[in-house]
């Protein structure tokens, strides 16, 4: 990078996961970076006042690759704190049976990590860099007509304007940056609330001195009940972050905490013992219900400003790709800057076309996967097909890849390409299935004919 390029200034709005990684990535390339965040520093907030709308994260190949791209040593430090999950553990409605469904063809795992912990790790990494972080700064105005000027209201209620060469919005699904950027360009935009709520619950560590985990830590636990479900992901301290998902009508149809406990006794009997009746009652009365929303827009940049992560493509959490996809946004943008020899404006312009199909694909896939997690994981036909898919993957190695493998463990395969491959493989499986059924039918008719002839 030339001295002129390295002096370029970058303003980033949003110090969540994607904003922090973007700040680290730009700083690694030698740019002068300032990061703004509406909230106070989360590391200074009492942990008892943590956000109870936070679903645990599953870090997989795409997220890891992005972390390694920015700083391999940082990636290693973060990955020391994850818990590998080799598959799903399905809990039946009796509370007496559990079934493991492995994820990877070759023992691959996705990795559980607490969202707040990861965010704090990235903020700690930023403290070691030359990035300037300004908390309690609310964006109220953005102008990219010449230089990029952003106006903020700070913690003292004073207005401050800062000027940058380029600006980046990573401030989430309800992005103020996106709202202001839309005024500067022709951006298609839509948002859709999904008829689904989530309520965070907590499974405490076991009191067993020999094992702090009350259930298997190396699985993502699912209690599938068709139109609602419960999940649980392990934390390093032996606890599990558990989340109850349901249509709003289900949770709103429960009128009291005692009724909520009874609902759990009936639908998740083994989970009641893990969470505790008092904790369930308290959670129903006190914990907030989170909404699920999908956001889509296009293009993502006007050449001076760009949106990444949930600000550009908020998705439902059912494929575990929200954070992984946002981190991948950062890596792909950085690679475009490299390809264009440091020309950030050209990289911003190319980013939208390079990313759109993949972002549309994963948003749809995430929504579709709710049905798989809540219902299909106990369907015999689905399980037979998954077993065949897995077996073909083991036999034909890289010639046949299950969709989950491509999405979670093959960061070299774009999301849209993975779906194309899966559609082709489904056609092959369907044709093979029809062929097998046809052969069986012909065989049956022949045998019936032989039997009939013997009777004559």
From Swiss-Prot:
Source organism, top-level taxon: Eukaryota
GO CC field: mitochondrial outer membrane; peroxisome; plasma membrane
Pfam families: FAD_binding_3
Keywords tagged on the record: FAD, Flavoprotein, Membrane, Mitochondrion, Mitochondrion outer membrane, Monooxygenase, NADP, Oxidoreductase, Pyridine nucleotide biosynthesis
Cofactor: FAD
S-S pairs: none
Pathway assignment: Cofactor biosynthesis; NAD(+) biosynthesis; quinolinate from L-kynurenine: step 1/3
Major subcellular location class: mitochondrion
EC number(s) recorded for this UniProt protein: 1.14.13.9
GO biological process terms on file: 'de novo' NAD biosynthetic process from L-tryptophan; anthranilate metabolic process; cellular response to starvation; filamentous growth; filamentous growth of a population of unicellular organisms in response to biotic stimulus; filamentous growth of a population of unicellular organisms in response to starvation; kynurenine metabolic process; L-tryptophan catabolic process
Enzyme type, top EC level: oxidoreductase
Subcellular location: Mitochondrion outer membrane
Catalytic activity: L-kynurenine + NADPH + O2 + H(+) = 3-hydroxy-L-kynurenine + NADP(+) + H2O
Database matches in SUPFAM superfamilies: FAD/NAD(P)-binding domain
Function: Catalyzes the hydroxylation of L-kynurenine (L-Kyn) to form 3-hydroxy-L-kynurenine (L-3OHKyn). Required for synthesis of quinolinic acid.
Protein family (similarity comment): Belongs to the aromatic-ring hydroxylase family. KMO subfamily.
This protein's name: Kynurenine 3-monooxygenase
Gene for this chain: BNA4
């Amino acid at each position: 990078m030339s001295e002129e390029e390295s002096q370029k200034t970058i303003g980033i709005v949003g110090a969540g996961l994607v904003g922090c990684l973007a700040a680290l990535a730009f700083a690694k390339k030698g740019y002068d970076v300032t990061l703004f965040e509406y909230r106070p520093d989360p590391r200074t907030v009492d942990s008892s006042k943590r956000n109870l709308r936070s679903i645990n994260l599953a870090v997989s190949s795409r997220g890891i690759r992005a972390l390694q791209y920015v700083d391999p040593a940082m990636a290693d430090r973060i990955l020391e704190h994850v818990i590998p999950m080799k598959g799903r553990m399905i809990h039946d409605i009796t509370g007496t049976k559990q079934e493991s469904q492995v994820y990877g063809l070759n023992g691959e795992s996705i990795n559980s990590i607490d969202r707040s912990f990861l965010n704090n790790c990235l903020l700690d990494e930023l403290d070691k860099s030359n990035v300037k972080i300004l908390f309690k700064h609310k964006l109220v105005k953005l102008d990219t007509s010449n230089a990029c000027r952003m106006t903020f209201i700070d913690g003292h209620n004073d207005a401050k304007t800062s000027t940058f060469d380029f600006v980046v919005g990573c401030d989430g699904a309800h992005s103020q940056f996106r709202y202001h950027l839309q005024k500067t360009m022709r951006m298609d935009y839509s948002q859709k609330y999904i008829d689904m709520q989530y309520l965070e619950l907590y499974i405490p560590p076991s009191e067993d001195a020999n094992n702090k985990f009350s259930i298997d830590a190396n699985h993502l636990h699912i209690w599938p009940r068709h139109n609602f479900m419960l999940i649980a992901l392990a934390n390093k301290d032996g606890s599990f972050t558990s989340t109850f998902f349901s249509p709003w009508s289900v949770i709103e149809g429960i009128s009291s905490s005692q009724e909520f406990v009874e609902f759990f006794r009936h639908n998740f009997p083994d989970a009641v013992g893990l969470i505790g009746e008092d904790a369930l009652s308290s959670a129903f009365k006190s914990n907030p219900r989170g909404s699920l929303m999908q956001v889509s827009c296009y293009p993502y940049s006007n050449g001076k400003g760009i949106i990444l992560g949930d600000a550009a493509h908020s998705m439902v959490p059912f494929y575990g790709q929200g954070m992984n996809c946002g981190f991948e946004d950062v890596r792909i943008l950085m690679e475009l800057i490299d390809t264009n020899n440091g020309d950030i404006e050209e990289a911003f312009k190319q980013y939208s076309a390079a990313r759109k199909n993949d972002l549309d694909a994963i948003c749809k896939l995430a929504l579709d996967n709710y049905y798989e997690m809540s219902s299909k994981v106990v369907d015999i036909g689905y399980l037979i097909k998954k077993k065949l898919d897995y077996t073909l993957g083991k036999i034909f190695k890289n010639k046949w890849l299950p969709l989950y493998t491509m999405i979670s463990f093959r960061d070299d395969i774009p999301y849209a390409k993975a779906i194309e491959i899966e559609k082709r493989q489904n056609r092959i499986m369907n044709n093979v299935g029809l062929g097998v059924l046809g052969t069986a039918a012909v065989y049956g008719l022949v045998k019936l004919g032989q039997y009939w002839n013997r009777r004559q």
